[in-house]
From Swiss-Prot:
This is Lysophosphatidic acid receptor 3. It is found in: Cell membrane. It comes from Rattus norvegicus (Rat). Glycans are attached at residues 15, 172. Keywords: Cell membrane, G-protein coupled receptor, Glycoprotein, Lipoprotein, Membrane, Palmitate, Receptor, Transducer, Transmembrane, Transmembrane helix. One of its GO terms (cellular component) is axon.
């Protein structure tokens, strides 16, 4: 029968796996790392709070897509909490942690990643429902959106707790990984493969939607009335989503590949030398998202700017021309029916020309 090591400190597992815990991070180097990390985390808290507040206060954002976008910002906010906890429980401190505290540290990171990933999957479903039905926004009710958000967090919390629930190597030391010394290599393989598979599915779905919208926009543009900005609104919304997805994949894929190599017990891969850089890259994803939201949507930018300047928000104010016009229209406008009406007009024009 295998001996279990629940009562050991983490130095026992780090020493067995020869894991680098950055003992050299002392003095000036440690202060610089903590200062830079603190700055990024404060920005994550501030900017993602603005995104959530903007969706709540501005009625132009009261659509399923933007509720889910706010939930993605909440996942980034949670990631900031996970990174703060990591900063003060890493380096030389890592070896002094108890098993439960280390599992909490890693569980927070796993939960934040799963929440972001699951939320992007839900957004993919919402976008597919709306675009394939010729609408800018889906007809999901607030109740259904709320249930989807709760489902996202339930899945995220469960996935973050799986190692704590038993899928670890505390009773089978020979199965321990190197980067995560009390995670089983089998769990790392499962976790990374499932995430990479989800990445692939999302990319396929979004590329399919993007190509569909682009094709429809190109076909309908010569035959439809209305401003160019309104005709291109669906494409602009998809570009925002694709930019967020692209940033997520670029920031997280390298780290997941390294974890997969560790799970496969690759001895020649030198995974220890790159782990901190890929963790920093993952941190930058939560920094980038609010910047993407505000840059790609003028209404989001204006709402966030007014909140920063403590200016009153007038939801009835006339919008100014934007560098990239917002994709949101009022409910009394043709926003939700725009694509459907455009197709009808295009068909009429085609018949007339024939």
């Amino acid at each position: 029968m295998n001996e279990c090591h629940y009562d050991k400190r983490m130095d026992f597992f780090y020493n067995r796996s020869n894991t680098d815990t950055a003992d050299e991070w002392t003095g000036t180097k440690l202060v610089i790392v903590l200062c830079v990390g603190t700055f990024f985390c404060l920005f994550i808290f501030f900017s993602n709070s603005l995104v959530i507040a903007a969706v709540i206060t501005n009625r132009k954002f009261h659509f399923p897509f933007y509720y889910l976008l706010a939930n993605l910002a909440a996942a980034d906010f949670f990631a900031g909490i996970a990174y703060v906890f990591l900063m003060f429980n890493t380096g030389p401190v890592s070896k002094t942690l108890t098993v439960n505290r280390w599992l909490l540290r890693q569980g927070l990171l796993d939960t934040s990643l799963t929440a972001s990933l699951a939320n992007l999957l839900v957004i993919a479903v919402e976008r597919h429902m709306s675009i394939m039905r010729m609408r800018i926004h889906s007809n999901l009710t607030k109740k259904r959106v709320t249930l989807l958000i709760l489902l996202v967090w339930a899945i995220a919390i469960f996935m973050g707790a799986v190692p704590t629930l038993g899928w670890n190597c505390l009773c089978n030391i020979s199965a321990c990984s190197s980067l995560a010394p009390i995670y089983s290599r089998s769990y790392l393989i499962f976790w990374t493969v499932s995430n990479l598979l989800a990445f692939f599915i999302m990319v396929v779905v979004y590329v399919r939607i993007y190509m569909y919208v682009k094709r429809k926009t190109n076909v309908l543009s010569p035959h439809t009335s209305g401003s160019i900005s309104r005709r291109r609104a669906p494409m602009k919304l998809m570009k925002t989503v694709m930019t967020v997805l692209g940033a997520f994949v670029v920031c997280w894929t390298p780290g997941l590949v390294v974890l997969l190599l560790d799970g496969l017990n690759c001895k020649q891969c030198n995974v220890q030398h790159v782990k901190r850089w890929f963790l920093l890259l993952a941190l930058l994803n939560s920094v980038m998202n609010p910047i993407i939201y505000s840059y790609k949507d003028e209404d989001m930018y204006n709402t966030m700017r007014k909140m920063i300047c403590c200016a009153p928000h007038d939801s009835n104010a006339e919008r100014h021309p934007s560098r990239i016009p917002s994709t949101i229209h009022s409910r009394s406008d043709t926003g939700s029916q725009y694509l459907e009406d455009s197709i009808s007009q295009g068909q009429v024009c085609n018949k007339s020309s024939s």
